[in-house]
């Protein structure tokens, strides 16, 4: 069955009105959704209400949006890291978990400009104990030296074969490097060169541990020089 309509559109007071000719719907009077068919003054008329969306966000909503924007951008830059650091948390993605846990670590000024507190940022989160790692930097050689202290096993919270990682983040360039260190049950020193184009003054350093199978992690800790 085919319906043939001849529409002529008119707009009055946020309503769209269309005059139509249909042999099958002559003198129709019916409503379907936001469309009303009627017969008036010898003509078939279809009326549709136009709904407009009013968006008057409060200061709190604007601040929330600013935080979300900066954290979503950061999560993209750190994606290979947070995929290891946020596992088995809730039903969402690692990026969603990262964003949710770090909302309180972002401040917003009166112009709705968001600033991340990198000294409190979590690039990993979980039930494992954080590893014990210290770092130094050689300006002459442009090398980071990560010194790792062996930890005893704690059933359910720390295992000798847990994998320890360091993460370097260049805050101006927005680039990250993930460095595998040693197993939790080992002492040792691991060196890593400052990447080209990076400025040491802009680098933030973090460490965390994961289960050997990658299905669990510790909270990350910021490392200071």
Predicted features along the sequence, with ranges:
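Long, polar/Ser/Thr-enriched low-complexity segments
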Residues: 2-4, 8-130
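Charged linear interaction tracts used for macromolecular binding and regulation
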Residues: 89-225
